[in-house]
Structure formats: C-alpha cells, structure tokens
C-alpha cells in the first residue's frame, strides 16, 4: 500500500534527522496484530490471527528494507501489551475520560480540552467529511473505541468489561507510554 510506504519513508527521514541532531532518540513503531481486518482475514483463511500478522509483518518489514527504510529500534506487538492497555483504560475511566456503554469502552473526546491541538483542527472541523457514525455504544460521533467485545470464536482477553480486545488508539498510546517512558 503506497500510503503505508509514504508514511514509513517520511518517518524514516525524520528519525534520521533527529538521530543526527540528538543523542537519545528512540524510534518505536508498533505492529497492530489484532483488529477487525486481521480477524476477518484469519477467518477467511481459517488460520490463527497470529499467523496472519506474522506473515504480513514480515512482508512489510522486507518491503521497507527494500526502500532503504531503517527498522525501528523497538517494534512491539499490540497483543504483548494487553494488560498495560487494560490498566490505561481503567485509569481513563477513573479520570472520566472514558465510559462503558453496551460492553464497549469509549474515549470521551470532549473530556480532553486539547484534543486536535497537534492537527490544529477544532472538534467541529474533525467531523467535516468524516466516515464516523453514531452507534448505540457512543455518546457522540467523535468518541472512539478503547475496548470492544469479542465474539466467542474470535480472539479476546478477559477484562473488567468482559472478554474483548483493544481498539487501535489505545494500542499506540499504551505502547508509546511504556516503551518510550513518556508521560501521556
């Protein structure tokens, strides 16, 4: 996918510049090894989801090397950090930044006054032309999934909210916080 390659090349350039200028640069780039697309592919091929992610991770990493994109210093897999994700979600709920609705845990975007600061887009601008839909487990269209229930035949982990799996956003923030030792 050209979009993935573009992002990797741009990130590689940025990391190389930062490593020239600063002594302690740690480049962490995770592998999302659990999501709906992976589960669907696993079900279609009738193979475990880990086999799907291992296959495509290897292909991706080889393609990046062929583009002369340096590998990350650390390349964690989301499923290796499920317990940390659960702890972070619990903290977000405690701080009223997340809520549980219909067996889903959602991040309450309006609870974070700086949301959109990096993109320089207001909350209203972020909805323009978006593919976001209101569902029976969201208070507002902006809110996003931190934890979603898994069907019995799908991969899942036990949590205070029932058996399920993490949403994409919590994966990145949890691993960044843990592995980069940054405060989020």
Tell me what each language-model feature is.
Residues 2-183:
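NTP-dependent nucleotidyl-transfer catalytic core
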């Amino acid at each position: 996918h050209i979009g993935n390659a573009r992002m990797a090349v741009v990130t590689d350039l940025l990391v190389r510049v930062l490593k020239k200028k600063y002594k302690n640069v740690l480049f962490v780039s995770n592998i999302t090894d659990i999501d709906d697309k992976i589960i669907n592919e696993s079900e279609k091929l009738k193979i475990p989801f880990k086999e799907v992610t291992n296959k495509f991770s290897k292909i991706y990493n080889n393609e990046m090397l062929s583009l002369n994109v340096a590998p990350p210093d650390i390349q964690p897999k989301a499923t290796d950090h499920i317990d940390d994700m659960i702890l972070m979600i619990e903290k977000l709920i405690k701080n009223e930044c997340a809520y549980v609705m219909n067996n889903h845990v959602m991040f309450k975007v309006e609870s974070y006054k700086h949301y959109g600061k990096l993109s320089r887009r207001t909350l209203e601008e972020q909805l323009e032309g978006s593919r976001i839909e209101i569902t029976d487990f969201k208070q507002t269209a902006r809110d996003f999934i931190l934890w979603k229930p898994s069907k019995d035949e799908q991969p899942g982990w036990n949590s205070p909210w029932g058996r399920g799996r993490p949403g994409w956003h919590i994966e990145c923030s949890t691993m960044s916080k843990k592995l980069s030792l940054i405060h989020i």
